[in-house]
Amino acid sequence: MTTLGHAAETQFHGPPNLQGARPGASVIVLGAGLAGMLAAYELTRAGYKVKILEFQNRPGGRNWSLRGGDTYTEMGGATQKVGYAAGNYFNPGPWRIPHHHRTLLHYCKAFGVSLEPFIQYNHNTWMHSSEAFGGKPVRFNTAAADFEGNIAELLAKSVNAKALDDAVTLEDRERLLEALKGWGMLDKDYKYVSSLRASAHRGYDRPPGGGVNGAPIASKDLNSLHDVLDPQVWSSIGFFMGHEMQTTMFQPVGGMDMIGKGFAKQVEGLITYNAKVSKVAQDDKGVAVTWTDTATGKTTDAKADWCVCTIPLSILGQMDLQVTDEMMAAIKAVPYSGQVKIGLEMKRRFWEEDESIYGGHSFTDQEIALISYPNNNMFKDGPAVLLGAFAREMGAYRLAGMTPEQRIEVALQQGSVLHPASYRKEFSNGASVAWSRVPWAMGCCARWNEDTRKEHYQTLVGMDRRIVLAGEHASYVGCWMEGALLSSIDAITRLHKRALEA
């Protein structure tokens, strides 16, 4: 099917074939994120001598979870001590895995990382726009059904007015009308009106039941064409049609950092933590990396034949790096996005118990952008953590300029618009991560555009003598773990080829 252009997935054809490594050949890997650990794992299997230097005291890089008792200090000095209950967590970075990210799924299975479903599309969540529906949230299924119904009625009018006769044949005209009636839940006159037919999609005023009052009552207050044409409505519906956002999705059982921990077990003993790299030099014979142990202050030079560098470009561009001017220009040309995520722990699962919301996302045009509900431990008593903000662009810019406490307050204010009865009442504690303030990344992920890709991408992913870069920034699957892994496989495959030719 893939050869016919159907069911296409990312470019993963299995683990790399790195046969024939020269005895004693060595590689130093900078960064113990997923790209770095995969590179080390596959190179070690091939016979290379590998060492990983990692700035932090843990593996995973941006593959990260915050738990109760954790402490996080952002740039500017603000420190948060996470107060979540035991077993709860917040994923500040990646948090979901599309079904077609075959590389990541392959290695999760190979490394024993257990996955569970991530509920992406939930018809019963909320959709909110300050410019539509009187500024009040409506259920997602209601807005989506009314969008379809209003658009179908409008198009049916055009067909019946013969406005499309030049575009469709007589046969297709009848088929189109039939499709519009079915898709848009129109009546016999091609009108979108209150009916049991429409309620079967958007919900009832009284749902079907049993006994004397079992007959359903159709919902009467349909939303207008004007309201459903609000950009928040159609963009939220279209969100789930994007290839990267389509179901099925997955998440690791127990938190996203389980992936980093699973990878780290495969390269146990190869990682040096608390290693701050300050300089990377190279010549025709090898690579020398100067790094400092942040715990002791001791500075060391590490040498190897080759280097796989997975440090984010936002950091790498500030380092003493001996590469060509073209490579350095490419590194400095790519900006990073600055998303803000906020994890709020609530005393109980009111979204489940009071509103029948089990997983999925509610959307809003406020700065928080969305609320995402946990996919694990459903129906359980006790506290749970929901994602109270995934702010982007100007919303993220404003939130990043606040203190962590101020961010929590904004999340509570704006989240209360969607859950007015429970949000503040059930709030326990929270944590936030503004990616532009993360000291070891200074941004969430690389943001290429057409011009920068055309000018710099091939330089960035090419080998610079004995140094090759890897990470989501060196891929066309940017901001996803899949991109990091695919770039890693590509980088070490080319490094291996170069090593055999040397």
Model-derived features: where do they sit?
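Conserved flavin/dinucleotide-binding core of flavoenzymes
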Residues: 4-14, 286, 338, 352-502
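Mid-domain catalytic core of redox enzymes
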Residues: 273-387, 418
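Charged, often glycine-rich, active-site loop that binds/positions anionic groups
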Residues: 130-139, 278, 283-295, 434-454
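Active-site/ligand-binding neighborhood in enzyme catalytic cores
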Residues: 124, 131, 159-276, 284-286, ...
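N-terminal glycine-rich phosphate/pyrophosphate-binding loop and immediately adjacent elements
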Residues: 15-157
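Rossmann-like dinucleotide-binding core of oxidoreductases
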Residues: 120, 130-168, 316, 347-368, ...
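Short glycine/proline-rich turn/loop motifs
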Residues: 18-21, 81-89, 234-248, 389-398, ...
